[in-house]
């Protein structure tokens, strides 16, 4: 039976709610300013500046939460606010959000602040937003000068080519295009190649999100074509063809291609969104089946994505009955990994003790994971969600897993009634371990896996990442067939490594020895020594040497390091370079146009 609610009588309750919302609004203003700055940096081709901006934005949320907590403690002695007041704070906050344009993100910010203040009381659902209180349906910015979430274009009156040109020019990028008419013709040809000639239905139209999506050296136009009952997604990457000159690089017309550029293995986009829920709804319409949590994360709202993921997990637990088990495969020396078979993620915990030869600490491993979070992942390193105080029902934990937890991570678990509380863990997308993929694959799959592995490591080294442990078991194969690195405890910056050749043996005894006859420093790497570990399977060896014979040559690694030390940033593509217009339709490009490209890498 529900009781008549008490009056909201606490002035402190209202003041605290208003203070939290003011701090969220400041956070989101800074978030949007970063996207505006990204446009300027892109136009000026300031790639180092874009990298810096992306790193700073990742840490911005935690900085704003910390500032808000400090303010509440100074102004209201927040830790000692009476428990009867906190529900009033929440209700006042809900009232303040009724016409807000980012209510879901503001609720998550409220939870983050409360977690810092209330500590274990976080589990009191009356104090926080376990479920959303404010609907995000049909939110739109109706201010006169505001951009709509997306713009609708109707090609029937002016023709498709003219409409596509207007779509591009409406973004008002400062640098001129090398040959926009040529690029539009390439888009028209690509659409014809993909779909053939199609009749224009009475509702034929194109919807384009009003803001560009910035990442690495690319700005993406994202939209959908509506024709009859068909919804056709598309993305058009805009790049610098040369200094101060832009070009449309390709058009991506398949959902799988869009899912890859928005995948968990890429860094977050910088995109200006006044109503983020409307952007997410649009993106889900062109990538159905992609979780909202992943989309929020990919557009830079990783805390909102993390919040939604946890809700998805709780929802899944309430609608499933299988048990968490130790993850199959080779056990790691540093991490304990478990999974729920019906849920496509793995849960990773840092062990309390590491056997030799591992020489590291929990703090060092956490620093490695933070490094990856802030680094440009290029589609080759899995993103991780980091959680504290996660309560899992004991009844859903396999007995063997409980024994493993008690043995390997006793400092990280606590029993609370019918729950096991995990103090700290990482969560990643579940992938097929590359060693199992190669072990069980057909000849074509082995060739694909080996080619992808070599490409992944080469792209990582160009991005200043040395994986450390090169074994296949530390890499996974995604649903889209891409090889991604996911074991970070030995990761280093390539520029911190000393690339060395193996010195020749001094005598026969050296040559027969199983131990190195030369000194090895802590940051020395010897690419020649990787071959015995990677080429043991004759089938793998054949394809590896066919595609990546240079992999074991120290000069390849040294050249990448030298370019990094000179401040060079190579070109990476979140799609196959073969899709680029300059490669796909070379007859349309004059010598010296965007096709000069230089060294390419698919990321």
From Swiss-Prot:
**Localization per record:** Cytoplasm
Q: Which reaction does it catalyse?
A: L-seryl-[isocitrate dehydrogenase] + ATP = O-phospho-L-seryl-[isocitrate dehydrogenase] + ADP + H(+)
Q: A Pfam family in this protein?
A: AceK_regulatory
Q: Among its keywords, does the record have Nucleotide-binding?
A: yes
Disulfide-linked positions:
none
Identify the GO cellular component terms for this protein. Answer: cytoplasm
Keywords, alphabetical: ATP-binding, Cytoplasm, Glyoxylate bypass, Hydrolase, Kinase, Nucleotide-binding, Protein phosphatase, Serine/threonine-protein kinase, Transferase, Tricarboxylic acid cycle
Q: Where is the active site?
A: 383
- GO BP terms: glucose metabolic process; glyoxylate cycle; tricarboxylic acid cycle
Q: Kindly indicate where the leader peptide sits in this chain.
A: none
User: Which family, according to the similarity comment?
Assistant: Belongs to the AceK family.
Q: What is this protein called?
A: Isocitrate dehydrogenase kinase/phosphatase
